[in-house]
């Protein structure tokens, strides 16, 4: 396909949407496209120099006349500047609000008829979509986009349920860089964490928000621990951390729970893990599950949102109902005490990632989408010239 000039806007901090947006930009650059990140800071995963990747900082000044910093206006203005200067073909924004709305405003400001692609990641729909004061803004951003994608079928359906839009939505799953997330042997790392030979390692990684349901993670682990020797690695930080620490301190198994805080090299932690738990109350996809599976770690997740689209029950993990910590424990013990079954689940996890979420497959889907948007724009311009 023709090499395109593509702008990407996302939240540059740690989080699934920022990770996917940044990795997408890097992989598109490796395929020869020119990528322009338009964000408030350098995306944290943009850790390599590319000759065809550019960063345009959105500077937000604090003016005394405004109660809050005018990020949205500053972003739209920066988008318009970059669009005119670089002659972008596509602006791919992650989140309907504020980013899609800002993109539409930037198109009006710049006078350039470029294509707007909006990817819905979950929070913009599952949380904000339930706020009646924001629903119309979300609908506006979606309806004025030239193409809209969702990271799971569940999120796509939820969008139609919550937002009164008739816009077509394509499901394009998240992906992982399999050069980074892959099985490695780091058995010596277990010793550093005090993991004994007969202990299995269970891992949970999140931002420790209430929605991630940490109390059930810990409660499930304690039930597992009653049946077998194991360690729980809690990776991350956030508002629920102190509450969870209190829950752990009250248990006889407090010495088997390790709080590791935020970690950069989570592939090393997956290398010593046997099972991933994700028991969220809401989850549009569950990128961390995919990262674990790419390292050969099966998972147990709740029957929520896009999680059942990642975990195939009884094949590469298990699906449980929200709140059913006994089922989590039963499945975990059943799996972790059967080495043959665990090995089978590990292989199935690797196969699932390669077959359904391979980076090249997903990138090709985005390229096809961009090509379609650009072709439609060119057709519209041709028709307008004839008229």
Regions found by a protein language model. Name each.
Residues 8-15, 26-71, 169:
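N-terminal strand-loop element at the rim of the active site
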Residues 154, 175:
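Carbohydrate-associated surface elements
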Residues 182-195:
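A short helix/loop element that forms part of the nucleotide-sugar donor recognition site in Leloir-type
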Residues 245-261:
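Nucleotide-activated donor-binding/catalytic signature segment of Leloir-type glycosyltransferases, i.e.
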Residues 313-314, 318-325, 334-340:
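Conserved acidic donor-binding segment of nucleotide-sugar-dependent glycosyltransferases
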């Amino acid at each position: 396909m023709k090499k395109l000039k593509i702008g990407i806007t996302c939240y540059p901090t740690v989080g699934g949407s920022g990770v996917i947006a940044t990795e997408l930009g890097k992989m598109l650059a490796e395929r020869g496209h020119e990528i322009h990140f338009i964000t408030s800071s350098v995306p944290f995963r943009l850790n390599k120099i590319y000759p065809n990747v550019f960063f345009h900082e959105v500077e937000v000044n604090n003016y005394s006349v405004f109660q809050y910093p005018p990020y949205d206006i500053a972003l739209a203005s920066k988008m318009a500047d970059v669009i005119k200067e670089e002659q972008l073909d596509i602006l791919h924004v992650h989140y309907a609000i504020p980013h899609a709305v800002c993109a539409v405003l930037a198109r009006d400001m710049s006078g350039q008829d470029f294509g707007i692609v909006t990817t819905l990641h979950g929070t913009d729909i599952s949380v904000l979509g339930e706020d009646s004061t924001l629903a119309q803004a979300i609908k506006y951003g979606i309806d004025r986009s030239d193409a809209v994608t969702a990271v799971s079928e569940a999120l796509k359906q939820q969008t139609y349920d919550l937002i009164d839009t008739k816009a077509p939505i394509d499901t394009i799953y998240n992906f992982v860089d399999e050069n980074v997330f892959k099985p490695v042997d780091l058995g010596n790392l277990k010793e550093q964490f005090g993991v004994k030979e007969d202990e299995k390692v269970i891992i949970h990684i999140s931002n420790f928000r209430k929605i991630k349901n940490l109390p059930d993670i810990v409660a499930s682990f304690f039930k597992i621990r009653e049946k077998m020797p194991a360690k729980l690695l809690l990776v991350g930080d956030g508002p629920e951390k102190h509450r969870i620490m209190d829950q752990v301190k009250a248990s006889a198994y407090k010495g088997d729970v390790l709080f590791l805080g935020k970690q950069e090299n989570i592939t090393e932690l997956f290398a010593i893990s046997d099972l991933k738990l994700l028991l969220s109350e809401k989850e549009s996809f569950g990128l961390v599950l995919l990262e674990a599976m790419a390292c050969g770690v099966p998972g147990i997740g709740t029957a929520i949102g896009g999680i059942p689209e990642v975990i195939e029950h009884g094949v590469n993990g298990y699906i449980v109902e929200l709140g059913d910590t006994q089922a989590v424990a039963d499945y975990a013990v059943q799996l972790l005490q059967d080495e043959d079954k665990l090995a089978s689940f590990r292989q199935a996890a690797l196969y699932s990632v390669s077959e359904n979420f391979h980076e090249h497959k997903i990138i090709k889907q985005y390229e096809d989408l961009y090509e379609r948007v650009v072709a439609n724009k060119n057709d519209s311009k041709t028709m307008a010239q004839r008229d």
